[in-house]
Each structure stands twice: as C-alpha cells, then as structure tokens.
C-alpha cells in the first residue's frame, strides 16, 4: 500500500480537480465505456483503455479494492450496417471484432475488467429501466419507439454545459418525438434487424440506455467513477446522467474523460479515414513501447500521433530498459523497490503521468551515474524505484509479461488475431463472389504492411518487414 498524499481527479461536471473520496472506504467502483465492436481496434480506441488502466493500477497500489466494469456495445446501427455490407450475421460480426479488441487490450497488458458485460446480455435490465422512466413521467412512447423527455429533467446539460435551446441529439428528425431534443431509449423493430419483445412491441435498445442499465446492474444505483473518451461527453454521457438520475439513482460521483489521439489535428476516426490500426503499429514497435507511448501524455490532453513522436517514446523506453539490463548484468537481480515521493505526488495530482515519467528518467540518469562510479547500492536503489514506477504505468521492462517473450512474439500474437478477423471477412466475400470487397480487404492489409497469399491450404500472411510467416486461422 502506497503512503502518499490525497488523490485529486479532474471531474468533468465540476470542471475542476477535486479531492477523491470513495463512496465506501477502501473500495472504488469504476465504469468505463468500452468499445462498440463495429471494426478493428485502432490506437485511438486503446488509448482510453491504457489511460484508465493506469488509474486502476494506481488505486490498487494505494490499497483500494477496485471493481472495474468495461462494457461491450454489441448491438448498434454501425454494427448492423457493416455486417450487412459484408454479408455476415450481425452477431458474428460483433463477436469477431470483440475478440480483436480483447487481443489488443491483452497485447498492451491492460488488466482484464472485473466484468465485461455485453449489451445484448442485459435487455431485461434495460426494459426495467425504461418502465421506471415511463412510470415517473420521464419517458413516453412514440409510435413503436420510446423516448426520454429531456424537458422533464431540469438539470439536463450539467455535464456538457449545453444549453437547452441548442441541444441537438444527432438522431435526425424523428416523427414520434414530442420534442426533437428528446433522445431514443428504445427503437422499434425494423425488417431484417434483431429485436426483443417488450411491453411496447419488439425492438432494440438505444445506445445511451445500455450503459445506464449495465452500470446499475454491476455497480448499483450509485458508484464512484465513470470514464470514457471526451467525445462521449455529449450526447452519450449527458443522456446517461439524465436517464439514471431521473429514476433517483445517484449514478457516477466523478466523471473522467480522456483526450483523443489525433493525426494532423483531426480526431482519429474510421469515418475520417485516418485510423492507425494496432497491427500496423505493432509491426514497427513492441507492445510495451506502444503502451509507453499511449500512456506518456496526460490523459486529458490530445495525443498528436507522428512517427517521430512514436520513435521518441521508443527511445525513452529503451533507455530505461537498457539501464535495468545493465544493472542486472553488472550487479545482480533487480527487485521492485519503493516509489519516489515525487512520482507518487505526480499521480496523486490528477494522474500527471508526464511528471511521473520525468521522475523515472531522473532515476535512470542517477542510476547510470552510480553504476559508472561503482556505487552498486545506489544503482540498485534507483533500478528498484524505476521498476516500481514503471510497474504502476504498466510497462516495467523486467516484468515477466514483457521479458517472457522475444522482441516480436507478443506483437505477432496480437497481429495474428486481428488479421484473422480481416481474412475471415475476405473469405466470406470470396464465397459470395464479391471480388471487389475481397480485393479491398487484401489491399487494406497490404497498406498496413501485411502480404496475403492464397494457397491450397487457405490464405497465409506475412509481415513485409519481417521474415516470419504465420498460417492464417
């Protein structure tokens, strides 16, 4: 247990850093909005996972018992549309890409969540929440849909700061709404789409409803921290607050939001075509190096991707790794030591990772100096502190997680899972004689540095920059 000062976190509702006081002493409950499993994960997706994994590790180091819930949105318009375009069942499409996200998180040593609920597994809880909202006058039916009445909740806008006169839900004009500022809780069934029976007819859940219902199911009516990307502040998180507090739930007491990964000043997004997939990056750097890069900026700041910045992070990580290896070779085994007070103070100050990393590199410089003058005790002390600090950040170079693999095996394991999903889509397209789509998938893989060869034993792939070939699954 870390004996440090008081943890302070930036709460989006307050617009300021606040002292963190958990609902129950010794326990922290966290809900992180996970992936909508519509496609392959890119580094913008996993930045959120890494950022709040550091928060979780720091809370655990401070002695807290942490319940960490990360959901999976496995039913959504985008999933249905992309699965239909690929000629695949929606549930298969979602499951394939859920596995890809799991592989990406695992490759970067993001700790598994305490629970990872899927939206489709919690339809009953969603229906119960809608019934409560209707009973309390906060929701109404409109045609085959159910909507939340925004005007019925006076505090609407408290998270995002949006004024009622300027609210736009992004749902388009819907005839069943009493007010176009209202948002959808339940979508009436459409031909060919999955649906579930309800008192209002068959249909499927709205996006915002899913998270409120699952957070309630796993963490109760009130919990400590809700996390997610800053792009979710409005409308997603604003609507979560409204529908949960409208039925009397306290819901989240702190709201934390991470910044985007950007390219050329634009948010990394599939719709903009500027995404950088996990396989493409892991072809060039090791998983520990990518994790170091994604976690090195303050979680609330934008992370502008560039090859130069990525290589700077690799160089910094390798510098730490080389120092620890030097000490182990010249002095002996390096155990995990004590965190420095400045490192602890940095993380207590709203997870100021850049300042914490400055302390890591200060210890590296001091440790190298001690090693050079034969001060083995000083070298070991600094090396032990570095292992402790890098462990909190999830990328201790001497941790068996990273040491047990050679330089490329971890990357190849992750790439294998991710590429297999793409090849599965390509094979489906070929079977349907959709040669255009099949060629597009092949070309997309080639752009990421992966060469696909069709053989009598099925497709095989290899990294263009390497010499190891792996049979496709």
UniProtKB/Swiss-Prot annotation:
Enzyme Commission number(s) from the entry: 6.1.1.16
GO cellular component terms, A-Z: cytosol
Positions bound to ATP: 270
Motif residue range(s): 'HIGH' region: 35-45
Binding-site residues, Zn(2+): 33, 211, 236, 240
SUPFAM superfamilies assigned: Anticodon-binding domain of a subclass of class I aminoacyl-tRNA synthetases (SSF47323), Nucleotidylyl transferase (SSF52374)
InterPro entries hit by this protein: Cys-tRNA-ligase, Cys-tRNA-synt_Ia_DALR, Cys-tRNA/MSH_ligase, Rossmann-like_a/b/a_fold, tRNA-synt_1_cat_dom, tRNAsynth_Ia_anticodon-bd
Coarse class of the protein's main subcellular location: cytoplasm
Cofactor: Zn(2+)
Subunit-structure text: Monomer.
Record-given protein name: Cysteine--tRNA ligase
């Amino acid at each position: 247990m870390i004996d440090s000062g008081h943890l302070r976190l930036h709460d989006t509702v307050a617009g300021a850093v606040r002292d963190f006081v958990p609902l129950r002493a010794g326990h922290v409950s966290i809900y992180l909005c996970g992936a909508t499993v519509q496609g392959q994960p890119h580094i913008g997706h996993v930045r959120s996972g890494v950022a709040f994994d550091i928060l979780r590790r720091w809370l655990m180091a401070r002695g807290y018992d942490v319940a960490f819930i990360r959901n999976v949105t496995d039913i959504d318009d985008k999933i249905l549309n992309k699965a239909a375009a690929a000629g695949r069942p929606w549930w298969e499409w979602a499951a394939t890409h859920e596995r890809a996200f799991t592989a990406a998180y695992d490759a970067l040593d993001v700790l598994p969540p305490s629970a990872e609920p899927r939206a489709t597994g919690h339809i009953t809880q969603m229906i119960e929440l809608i019934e409560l909202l209707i009973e309390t006058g906060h929701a109404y039916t409109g045609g085959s849909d159910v909507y939340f009445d925004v005007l019925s909740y006076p505090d609407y806008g408290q998270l995002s700061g949006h004024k009622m006169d300027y609210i736009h839900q992004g749902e388009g004009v819907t005839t069943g709404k009493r007010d176009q500022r209202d948002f959808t809780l339940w979508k009436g069934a459409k031909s060919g789409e999955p649906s579930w029976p309800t008192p209002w007819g068959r249909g499927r859940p709205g996006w915002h409803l899913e998270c409120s219902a699952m957070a309630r199911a796993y963490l109760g009516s009130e919990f400590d921290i809700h996390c997610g990307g800053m792009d979710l502040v409005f409308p997603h998180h604003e609507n979560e607050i409204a529908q949960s507090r409208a039925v009397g739930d306290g819901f989240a007491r702190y709201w934390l939001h991470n910044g985007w990964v950007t390219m050329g000043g634009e948010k990394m997004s599939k719709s903009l075509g500027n995404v950088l997939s996990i396989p493409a990056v892991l072809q060039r750097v090791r998983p520990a190096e990518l994790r170091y890069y994604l976690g090195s900026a303050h979680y609330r700041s934008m992370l502008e991707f560039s090859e130069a910045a990525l290589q700077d992070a690799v160089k910094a990580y390798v510098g730490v790794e080389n120092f620890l290896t030097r000490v182990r070779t010249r002095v002996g085994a390096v155990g995990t030591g004590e965190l420095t007070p400045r490192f602890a103070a940095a993380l207590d100050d709203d997870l100021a990772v850049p300042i914490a990393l400055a302390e890591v590199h200060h210890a590296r410089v001091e440790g190298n100096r001690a090693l050079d003058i034969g001060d083995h005790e000083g070298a070991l002390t600094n090396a032990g502190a570095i292992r402790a600090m890098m462990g909190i950040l999830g990328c201790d170079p001497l941790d068996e997680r990273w040491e047990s693999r050679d330089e490329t095996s971890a990357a190849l394991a992750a790439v294998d899972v991710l590429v297999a999903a793409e090849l599965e889509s390509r094979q489906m397209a070929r079977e349907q004689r959709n040669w255009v789509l099949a060629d597009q998938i092949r070309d997309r893989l080639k752009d990421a540095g992966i060469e696909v060869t069709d053989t009598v034993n099925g497709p095989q792939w290899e990294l263009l920059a390497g010499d190891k070939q792996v049979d496709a699954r």
